[in-house]
Amino acid sequence: MLIPMLVVLGCALWAQRYQRGVADFLSAGRVGGRYVMSVASEMAGMGLITVVAATEAYYRSGLGYAFWEMLYLPVGFVLGLTGFCTYRFRETRAMTMGQFFEMRFSRSFRVTAAVIQSVSGIINYAIFPAVGARFLIYYLDLPGYVELGGWALPSFQLVMALFLGAALLITLLGGQVTVLVTDCVQGLFSYPMYLLILAFILWRFDWGTQVMPVLSSGEAGHSLLNPFEIENLRDFNAFYVFVGITGMFLGRLSWGGTQGFNSSARSAHEARMGNLLGTWRAQFYKWMSVILAIAALTYLHGRDFADEAHELRRELAS
């Protein structure tokens, strides 16, 4: 885990030399190709909290929700092939959403949008690093407190500070240039890791004798296997899928977290091709989350893992 972090920070320091002006800081000099854009932009939208949230959704709803979520794929292809929003946004030559708002509406609209985005971003950064920090503490079995200079410091706050500090360091070193390079490097690291995780889970759990009995043991009308019973699920159901598809149209290019990637491509055509390729690449992450959720269901509810599951629940409750 430490080696990839050092490699990413090294790439950030190396890429800093290419940051020479405002266009480089905000839009990476508009030099991104389709392959770099497809990897980096998808990686920018994925974090520990994203993995936790997706795994929780599949854990609660099973393969039924995963089946209907496949509708996102053709919708993503249509949006990518048509260049929906991409061409019109690049025609404005705006480098940020704020600049676009001022050009399209007014300066007061830009200020209002900036205030809303800043407040929501502060709230966002109070939740996202907290979830990621909690995950790493359990994953690495870190102690609750660390002795430092006679002070007992909570590991939770230290890991959160590490997350926030790393994000600020990478961003401030070279702006969108370093973000584009480091996200691309992280994406290249992640794909073989996805395959290793999938291979380990498929090797560790037997599908016929361990996985299927758990998936088929759901309540009547709330099957974890039958996609046509999804309307009976409480949280991640057909309405949730419909809202997600609607959001793909209404929220196109609007998320502030990846606004720098909207203007970083070499041309509008390269941006369109990057979005199209990114739709394919996102399936790696999606199915890794599905398999992780199935593994968690099997481990926590399977008869073969009853003792281990009891110990895990006791540890999480303590």
How should each PLM-predicted stretch be described?
Residues G21-V22, A28, C85, M97, ...:
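Glycine-rich, flexible loop/turn motifs
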Residues M1, R30, A44, T171-L172, ...:
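Short conserved micro-motifs on helix faces and helix-strand junctions that flank
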Residues M5-V22, M37-T55, L73-M95, L168, ...:
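Juxtamembrane transmembrane-helix boundary signature
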Residues S27-V36, A53-W68, E102, P143-F156, ...:
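Loop-to-helix junctions at membrane interfaces in multi-pass transport proteins
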Residues L26, A40, A167-L168, Q176, ...:
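A generic hydrophobic-helix recognition signal that picks specific residues
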Residues M43, A66-L172, V243-G251, G260:
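Helix-loop-helix module between adjacent transmembrane segments
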Residues M1-A23, M95-G98, E102-I137, M160-E219, ...:
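Membrane-interface loop-to-helix entry segments
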